[in-house]
């Protein structure tokens, strides 16, 4: 399938083409015949010709879609983890939503949701302890949406919802980016997050409970970790690497004002 407009829209910003910044970091430059090509066409040509390694590009997409552009965050406390603590507990659900794949895989370029199959898992990464129990699992959901591109005109697109489960801390986080020009209410961020939570419950037996007032200290610590995730784990393209100290100070400044949704 290759690079799609939907993937580009979830990574690039109007002020920065992060995909082409990455390509320059890989020492890839347009040839004279490639001048004027849009990003999508150029990347797919690079992939087809072998000048851009697909696994390398997939890793870039993993990082960007998991940590970049994710402004809305939900934090949950896990209940009975014993129901889904082994990789085998996840096999059936992963295979259902990832076209037959399970455990560790990445197929962001090869899988896109559609109206018939509106939810796909395009990336999964599991970390286990010596007893083969899961310590951490990361899953990236791709959700079919439509955006408005004019009066009564709509375009098929995709929103990515990263989910991370920390079994040691009994914590689950879900992140999302507020897309603009969403065509219908059921494609908006909160509706997508609710739907993914329902899938996790029904297909993976994930159960969560609300954080109460007695969990304020825990939530504060979680908030610090989430801010570090959001601002320190973005791929370090040159200028970002130089901002580490500034970002650290910024995290401290906003810790009391950032609106996190603790359900």
Describe the residue ranges of each PLM region.
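Short hydrophobic/glycine-rich mini-motifs in sensory/regulatory modules
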Residues: 169-171
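Acidic (Asp/Glu-rich), glycine- and aromatic
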Residues: 184-201
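Long, contiguous domain-sized segments
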Residues: 249-259
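Intrinsically disordered, low-complexity polar/charged tails and linkers
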Residues: 1-163, 182-189, 206-251
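Conserved small/polar residues in nucleotide/adenosyl-binding loops
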Residues: 261-263
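Conserved NTP-donor binding/palm subdomain of two-metal-ion nucleotidyltransferases/polymerases, i.e.
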Residues: 177
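Generic beta-strand structural signal
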Residues: 165-167
């Amino acid at each position: 399938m290759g690079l799609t407009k939907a993937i580009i829209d979830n990574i690039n910003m109007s002020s920065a083409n992060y995909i082409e910044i990455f390509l320059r970091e890989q020492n890839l430059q347009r040839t004279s015949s490639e001048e004027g090509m849009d990003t999508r066409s150029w990347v797919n040509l690079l992939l087809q010709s072998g000048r851009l390694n697909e696994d390398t590009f997939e890793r870039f997409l993993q990082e960007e879609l998991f940590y970049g552009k994710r402004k809305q965050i939900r934090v949950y406390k896990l209940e009975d983890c014993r129901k889904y603590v082994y990789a085998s507990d996840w096999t059936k659900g992963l295979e259902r939503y990832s076209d037959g794949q399970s455990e560790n895989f990445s197929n962001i370029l090869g899988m896109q949701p559609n109206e018939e199959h509106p939810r796909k898992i395009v990336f999964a990464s599991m970390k286990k302890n010596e007893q083969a129990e899961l310590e951490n699992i990361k899953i990236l959901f791709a959700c079919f949406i439509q955006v408005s591109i004019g009066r009564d005109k709509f375009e098929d697109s995709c929103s990515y919802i990263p989910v991370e489960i920390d079994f040691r801390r009994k914590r689950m986080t879900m992140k999302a980016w507020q897309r603009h020009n969403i065509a219908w209410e059921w494609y908006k961020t909160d509706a997508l997050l609710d739907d993914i939570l329902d899938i996790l419950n029904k297909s993976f037996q994930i159960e969560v409970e609300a954080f109460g007032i007695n969990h304020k200290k825990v939530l504060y610590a979680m908030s610090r970790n989430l801010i570090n995730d959001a601002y320190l784990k973005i791929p370090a393209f040159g200028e970002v690497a130089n901002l580490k100290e500034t970002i650290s100070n910024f995290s401290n400044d906003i810790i009391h004002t950032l609106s996190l949704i603790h359900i």
